[in-house]
Amino acid sequence: MNSITMQLQADKLIRMALEEDITSEDVSTNAVMPTNVKGTVDLIAKEDGVIAGMDVYARVFKLMDESMEIEMFCHDGDEVKKGDLMAKVTGDIRVLLSGERVALNYLQRMSGIATYTRSVVKLLEGSGVTLLDTRKTTPNCRVFEKYAVRVGGGCNHRYNLSDGVLLKDNHIGAAGSITKAIQMAKAYAPFVRKIEIETETLEQVAEAVEAGADIIMLDNMTPEVMKQAVALIDGRAQTECSGNITKENIARIREIGVDFVSSGALTHSAPILDISMKNLHAV
């Protein structure tokens, strides 16, 4: 785990996940498995994809029993093929069985996001457009999901509400206008913070430019209107395209000339990558 934020938060969140799943005991495992029996199990890819979350997977077992041994044959960012042996985990069989679901949930989810993100990044190659995620993440899993986006080749937008100013339609409504919202943000936020504002029409784009926005989000615009907006902005602000952007329609953004494209689908719609723990046996 390369992110300092992830290192600080991971153990706490993993413990919460284990407590949610195991609570007082794993009655199924404890009913059929005596204590202190050592075993080993294989981690196997059941489909092609990009791996993210190997350290999180390993950490689940280490938090349950520090003596657990994890031998990894792939690492975050690697592309695996169906049938590839990804790791071997050795230790108390009760720990292997009780921690399996939580460990796989993290690994499958994170690898699914990394796989989906990389496929979208490839569609944008050569365009100069930077792919961003959003805050549309699973509660208490943002640190893992945004990390997976980076593994897949995307970039993180704001991690939380303190990371930057993004004035959306309801902020504008509360302030009274785009101009007033930007003026208030400039007066409140530190000067090093960029001011981004959401626009839906060319009239709003023009107002945002005149008010001095640093980044102008072009939200739910057609490709034709976005082209007009980029021409209207004419380099006076950075541009971000947003609104129902998916792998299926992102290719239309390539030639428009925006700087960024943000997609909530990277985290809220990426399917999991099918990964399994198989061949458990005593050693």
Residue ranges and their predicted role:
Residues 247:
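Cys/His-rich Zn2+-binding cysteine-cluster or related metal-binding knuckle/ribbon modules and their
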Residues 235-238, 280-283:
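Short acidic, glycine/proline-enriched helix-loop-strand junctions
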